[in-house]
Amino acid sequence: LLSPVIGAIYGSSIQQKNSFLLDKIDQKVASDKMTLIDEPHLVKASGARYFDSEGVATKRLPVFEQGILKTYYIDTYSANKMGMEQTIGSPSILTMRNGDKDLDGLIASIDKGILVTGFNGGNCNSTTGDFSYGVEGFLIERGKLSQPISEMNATGNMLSLWSNLAEVGN
């Protein structure tokens, strides 16, 4: 579910006006629980890098801070086309700020919901943020897993989904 959000902040999407996050820098577009940082210099981490594919030096880059969009991934070409400052062309190592609960704690806190364990295809409209995904997992009732579910569709809008993020696991 994070992939369409990242795709929406690429310079090419912004330049082509094909993004549901167009003109949203420094605006609240997600829940306070959403803090996402690009950490390209994590020691011994897969994907760590000091330069992006264009040779631009990487640095720690806040992407979302408490639901506020802080940056786009602007490559050299897009920066020149839009007259914007380049950042880096693509994410390195994205880290989300941990919440306080483990998976069992998250499940126990839900009266009625669904634990999604897999996706069975689907799509997201990059301009509007509307999505539809096939999901499978387990029904949660009164804080406990009650029965498996499959062949179910989850539909909605990315801005609404991320604005309603209630918890992040640890």
Predicted regions and their residues:
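Dual-mode signal for accessory low-complexity, basic/Gly-rich regions
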Residues: 24-170
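Active-site pocket-lining segments that scaffold enzyme catalytic pockets across diverse folds
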Residues: 1-21
